[in-house]
C-alpha cells in the first residue's frame, strides 16, 4: 500500500471516529466549540478548581472551548450569556472568535508587547488559576516531540511563577512517553501538590494526560 493510500485510510478512520464520538456530539448539542471543554470540566468537577469571582488565564485558548467552559462556570446561573462574576484572560498566537466576557489577546506571551497587555488586564492582580491546553505540532520523531512538549510545559510553569497566586493552581496538558517523568518532577519542584489526571473525554488511543499543580512554591526555594 502506498504512503498516500495509507494516509487516506487513516484520515477516513479518524473522521469516522470523530463523527461518532459522543463528546463531539455533546459539544455540538451544548454549544461548545470543541470536545476539549469536557476535559477541563472533568478535572474541575474532580478537584473544584473553578469558582465564580476568580481571575483565570487560559493559555493556548483557541478555538475557545476551555474559555467557554470557564465563562459558564463563572456565571451565577452557569449560562453562556449570564452575568460574568470574575475575569477570564485568553491568550493564543492564533486568532479566536470572541466570547462574551472573555478578554482575548492574540500573540506570544513571551514577547514584551503582549505581556504588557496582559499586565494591563491583570492590573496588579494575580491569577487564581492558569489553564494550558497548549500542544505542539507533533512530528512523529519522539525526541523532537518530547522537547517541544517540555518547552510548552516550562513556559506554562514560568507564567504561573510570575502571575499566579501562591495558593493558586495550574492545569497543563502533556503526553505520556519520553520525558514525562522529568516533567512530573518539574511540576513537583514548583507546586506543593501535583495530581495527574486522564479525563474520560481524552481519546482512548491518545497519550494525552494533564498535570494539576496546586500551591505554588516560591522561586527562591527551588
UniProtKB/Swiss-Prot annotation:
Keyword Methyltransferase attributed: yes
Classification via Pfam families: FtsJ (PF01728)
Classification via InterPro entries: RNA_methyltr_RlmE, RNA_MeTrfase_FtsJ_dom, rRNA-MeTfrase_E, SAM-dependent_MTases_sf
SUPFAM superfamilies: S-adenosyl-L-methionine-dependent methyltransferases (SSF53335)
Compartments, as annotated in UniProt: Cytoplasm
Enzyme Commission number(s) of this protein: 2.1.1.166
One annotated Gene Ontology cellular component of this protein: cytoplasm
Keyword entries, A-Z: Cytoplasm, Methyltransferase, rRNA processing, S-adenosyl-L-methionine, Transferase
Residue positions binding S-adenosyl-L-methionine: 64, 66, 92, 108, 133
Domain of life: Bacteria
Reported function: Specifically methylates the uridine in position 2552 of 23S rRNA at the 2'-O position of the ribose in the fully assembled 50S ribosomal subunit.
PANTHER family cross-referenced by the UniProt entry: RIBOSOMAL RNA METHYLTRANSFERASE (PTHR10920), RRNA METHYLTRANSFERASE 2, MITOCHONDRIAL (PTHR10920:SF18)
Family classification: Belongs to the class I-like SAM-binding methyltransferase superfamily. RNA methyltransferase RlmE family.
UniProt name for this protein: Ribosomal RNA large subunit methyltransferase E
Source organism per UniProt: Variovorax paradoxus (strain S110)
Biological classification of the source: Bacteria, Pseudomonadati, Pseudomonadota, Betaproteobacteria, Burkholderiales
Gene expressing this chain: rlmE
